[in-house]
Structures are given as C-alpha cells and as structure tokens.
Amino acid sequence: MSLLLTIAKEYKRLCQDAKAAQMMTVGTVSNYTTFKKWTTSRKEKNPSLRMRWAMSSKFPIIANKRMLEEAQIPKEHNNVALWEDTEDVSKRDHVLASTSCINYWNFCGPCANNSEVIKEVYKSRFGRLERRKEIMWKELRFTLVDRQRRRVDTQPVEQRLRTGEIKDLQMWTLFEDEAPLASKFILDNYGLVKEMRSKFANKPLNKEVVAHMLEKQFNPESRFLPVFGAIRPERMELIHALGGETWIQEANTAGISNVDQRKNDMRAVCRKVCLAANASIMNAKSKLVEYIKSTSMRIGETERKLEELILETDDVSPEVTLCKSALGGPLGKTLSFGPMLLKKISGSGVKVKDTVYIQGVRAVQFEYWSEQEEFYGEYKSATALFSRKERSLEWITIGGGINEDRKRLLAMCMIFCRDGDYFKDAPATITMADLSTKLGREIPYQYVMMNWIQKSEDNLEALLYSRGIVETNPGKMGSSMGIDGSKRAIKSLRAVTIQSGKIDMPESKEKIHLELSDNLEAFDSSGRIVATILDLPSDKKVTFQDVSFQHPDLAVLRDEKTAITKGYEALIKRLGTGDNDIPSLIAKKDYLSLYNLPEVKLMAPLIRPNRKGVYSRVARKLVSTQVTTGHYSLHELIKVLPFTYFAPKQGMFEGRLFFSNDSFVEPGVNNNVFSWSKADSSKIYCHGIAIRVPLVVGDEHMDTSLALLEGFSVCENDPRAPMVTRQDLIDVGFGQKVRLFIGQGSVRTFKRTASQRAASSDVNKNVKKIKMSN
C-alpha cells in the first residue's frame, strides 16, 4: 500500500509540469499494442485486424533518426508527413515515422535504383492500384441481391498457365541445372523461358522472390466466392466493394477490352475453320477435327493448341459449340440461334409443326413449342431474360447494351419464339431463292427470317412493329423500350422492359455431350439441334496475327510470318537419320523426293506467285550443284528448299528469294528471316525465334547410336570421301573412308578399321573425337 501511495505522490508531482503530464497520458500506438501483447495471456482472435488498426495511425512505425538525417529524408513531402522529431519511448535514438517514409526511401531516397525492382516484385499489386484508379463509380442502390457462390478468377493475367506449367517454368528459369526433362510445354514455349531468364538476370532478387513473382504473373488465383453480375477477374478483385446482400454499387471496371478481344479472336478462328470444313464436299466433321488439331494460337508469349482452348472455355457461341461438339467435349445446357447465345432456365416445350406460305404459293413448314419456357439470351453488349409459349414471346427484360444491340436482340428473340405476323404470312420480299443455299441445301424458315432482317433496317423495324405498339405508362417511363431501342419513348413495344445493368448468365451445373453430323449440326441425345452451321454470322475479313494454321487447306488463312517460321521448323525436324529424311535423300541424290517433301509442299503457297518458277530453277540449281561438288551446308540447303517445289522456269533472278509477304532470304547471307552461325550450328533463327537442330551424336542425353558403329572410327575431314547413308555402311570396305551425317547440320568422316571389333571399345574414343572436331 505504501508503494502505491509513493507512486501516486510522484505522479502528482510530475503532473505539475505540462509536458511531463502529456507524455504520461498520451502514449504511442506501438507502445500500447506491445504492452497489450505481453501483458495478456489470451490469444489474439484477429491479429490481421489489429495490425491494420495499428498501421492506420499517423506514425505507426519507428525509424533511426541518424539514418534519416544522413539520407536527408525530409519531415514532409508533397504535404504528407513522413516523420516527426519525437523520440520513441521504447527504443533510444529512434523517432516516430509513417508508412509514407518507406515509399519515399524506396523511390526518392539514396537507394532509388531499387524502385524498378520493387515495382517488378509487387507488379500485381501496383496493377491492381492502377485499375482501381480507372474505375468509374456510379450510383449506390439498395436492393436485395441474389448472389451465387461460384469459382472465379480474382486476378487478371496476360496469359494463364496451369499449376504444373508454372512449376516447370519456375524450375527452368531459376534452377536450370536441377530442372527435370523438358515437358511439352517447355519445348513449345522455350522462348518464354529465355525471356524470363533475361528479365530477372543481374537483379538483386533471391530465387524465392522470383518464384513468387512468376506465380503471380501467370496464376489467376481462382476462388469460390458469392458473386453477382459479370465475373471478369477485374471485377472479382473488387467484388467486396461492389455489393452485399442488400446493396449494389454500380461501377465500370477496367480491363474489359482485352478479355472481350481474346474471346472474339477465338470465335473468329473457330468460325473460319467451321466455314472451311463446311466448304468440303465430303466428311465435313472429320475435316473440322483435322483443322482444329492443326491450329494453334499465341497468347502473350505462350503458344496454345486451339483444341485445348476450346475444351477449356465456357463460351457458348455457335462456332465454339460446333468445334467442341466435334472434339466430344462437355457443354452446359446451352444452345445458339444465329449470333444470339441462349441458355434455358426452366420449362420443357413440346414440338409442334405449322405452315407458312411464301408469296402465297409455296407452303413451308416450321416448328414451335407449345409449353412455357424461360431463357437467357445474349447478343453483343445486350442481354435478356424472356419467356415463350405457343407462338408468342410472352415477356422480355433486356439489360444493358446500346440501342442497336437491344433492337436486334429483341428481333432475334421474336424469331426464336415464332412471334409476330410473319409466322402467319411471310414477307412479300422473301422469294423462293431465299429458301436454299448455293449448294441446294434447304434453309429452315426461322433462318430465312434471320437473313431477311439482316438485309435492311426497314425489314428489322417491320418485324418489331408486328410485336405491337402501346402507349407508355407515365409511371413506367424509362423502363419500357421504344421502336428505336431507347428507354424514354412515348410509345413502346408490348411487354418489353429494360433495366440499366447487365443481366448475368445463370450457371449451368449439368453438363451434356453433343453429337455432330456431317452437315455440321450439333444435337443432344434427344435429337434437339443445339447449333448449326447456319447459326454462324457472315464471314468477315479477319486477319490473324497470333494464329498458326498448319493444315495445307488453311494456307489462305495463315499469318504468313508465323507460317514461314513454322514451315522452316518442320523442315529442320527432317534432319534425322531415317530413309526419308533430308540427309539420306541428299546422300542418295534423290532430288525429286527432296523437292516434293510434305514440308516443302506446305510452304509452297507462301512463295511469291509471279516468281515461283524462276525461284524454283535457281533453288534447285543451288541444291544440285552443292551436293554434286560435296561442298555444301545443310543450313543453307534448308534455307532455299521451300522454293524448289514448283516446276522450273527461265527468267531473270535478282539475287533474293521473296515470300508473298515481301520478306526474303538470300543464299549465303543471314537476315532476320533466316540466320545461323558456324560457331553454333545447333540453332537456326527464323524471325528471331531459335529453332534447335536435331542431335544424333552427343552426350549421354542424346542418341549415341552412331558412336557405337562397329568397326568404324572418326578421322579427319576428307571432302573427297563419298557421302553415304547409315544403311549403306554395311557395304564399306576395310580402310575406306566415308562421310556421314551426324546431326545439327554436321557431316563427319568415318573410316572402316576392322571387321570384328567390339563396339564398346570404340565408344569413348569416337565420342571424344566427335566432340573435339565440333
């Protein structure tokens, strides 16, 4: 008791001084939290929340005062307090500082060179901050929000990789010596590995940090979250700020264009291959599968097979649905109608047939459904929920979109529901020629109507007028749709309402498998047609910069730069030891087979058309002359081989061999299209992309079968020795020298030394000589 009384008296005496009283009554947050932590025995229930609370104060951290003064860190920068000259009571010579002091140290202090490294390490966080600044916030509405728990991506990435692919990339980038054998992903995307190595070379980062950065760059961080509305990653990272159970914050988030562009690119490629397969007279289904499996798309620096992208996507567009049906992939319960995407929500209709007369003469049958059904529809920027029953569109609610998209979406929903007077009497402008394709196939009447409204704006409005026009109720002004697609119309269309926000597509948990006919019609197990080739919009002139069409039938669709690189890559893969490989054909001087290789034929459409005969004469003469004299380079022969396919023709040669895209190669001269180095003959560069030349003889990781040739040893290069194939070695006599292709474009001279000599006794010597002669 006496001790407490003594402390109280001392406290009263100290409080007579104003400064001392303030120091004893006002403590720092750091002191308080430290005191609470070490004086309580209970476990902190929410350490993250306490840390955030502590860091929210003005000066939550401490800093060495001497270091701040030596580094000339100001107390204030851009009206933001960095530190104050108040000593921390828990640590001597330290003052109170704010978190902004750290930012100033990193970006403006003596270690400012680290700013770029810090930006790279926290690239995903800085990107999130930039996207946050681009958001256009709108009104806050209070309403009940129907949220669904779904698996969504919470981080937008430039290119998405699987977990196993990210691990392979980390190992090959950071631990090259300990990395496992190259997977197919590494072989196809080795350029990405080299890019990552050069990106992080000579930077003050440990490997654990770089591994974390690689994972953040390619991992979209999928989570199960209660969501509503669109599920783009740019929106999901802010879903906590966009709505709750009883409120919605309207906002336009950033990053929409890139996602939409990728979706449109894949739809365009699928549409091209579907139309190309449909143009074939027979086996359209098998042709479509061939086209899909021979096509790949480049996303960022990663090249992905179109087949993989189709099976992974949840896109329900008609072109993607047809391609997925051809591959046998599962789909949700979706269907397509022209360019409109549909998903059934409820109901099950019974199919009924009816008749409409064309020009009052020809009777054409069409089908409709007698029971009530509800659907979700999507066309470009507009979405809708609607109900159909019998031959009518009972009601429709359209969300978002511009006026033109809303008009066309409503028109397609009317045709889908067989609504309007034109399903009783056909328009007078529809003729008999509109009822069939150029190949004579009959077009169903609903697709005839789809083509009809595409011909003119008058046809579209005539169909909408058949819906019926009513006076807009003043109390519903702004929620009804006029004939021009606007919201605030005096006269509106019957039973058509508009809402401001976009309607989200309901998730389809049940998966089905579709069958694809040779007429390219996808149908389910009950025989219902889900998508047809007639659903595809008219073909547009689309250029593909990041798509590789390997199939010869699709040569007209190729991006020529990529096609040239792929063509040379295919030729380089023929540098093997097989009977039909390029070295064997050269040794046998089988020029006809050499000029008609499938890989040469594949590149034939890429040659400048008006000069192909002249180029063929020059290229064939170069090949035959060099092979005959024995002084040739396989790298140079590969360079001119694509120009040898056509029949030779006389003409003036200007010294360069041009492709149809005006790029060229020049015999004996390196350029950007084709280059190689004698110092490193293991690689050929096409448009800056390194293509590895196949190895036949090498170290323990390579095929050493040629080093095990019984009775042969490697000797000095002798250009007079005949060039033979591996199969002809049995005819070589004792003491004779022959030249043999050993890989990487190299030719070595071998000498027959004995008839019965153990192969194992020559292994070490042969491999050593080969390595020394390289």
Curated annotation (Swiss-Prot):
Disulfide bonds: none annotated. InterPro entries: Flu_PB2_2nd, Flu_PB2_6th, Flu_PB2_C, Flu_PB2_CAP-bd, Flu_PB2_middle, Flu_PB2_N, INV_PB2, PB2_helical. Influenza RNA polymerase is composed of three subunits: PB1, PB2 and PA. Interacts (via N-terminus) with PB1 (via C-terminus). Interacts with nucleoprotein NP (via N-terminus). Pfam families: Flu_PB2_1st, Flu_PB2_2nd, Flu_PB2_3rd, Flu_PB2_4th, Flu_PB2_5th, Flu_PB2_6th, Flu_PB2_7th. GO terms for biological process: 7-methylguanosine mRNA capping; cap snatching; DNA-templated transcription; symbiont-mediated suppression of host gene expression; symbiont-mediated suppression of host mRNA transcription via inhibition of RNA polymerase II activity; viral RNA genome replication. One of its GO terms (molecular function) is RNA-directed RNA polymerase activity. Keywords: Cap snatching, Eukaryotic host gene expression shutoff by virus, Eukaryotic host transcription shutoff by virus, Host gene expression shutoff by virus, Host nucleus, Host-virus interaction, Inhibition of host RNA polymerase II by virus, mRNA capping, mRNA processing, Viral transcription, Virion. This is Polymerase basic protein 2. The gene is PB2.
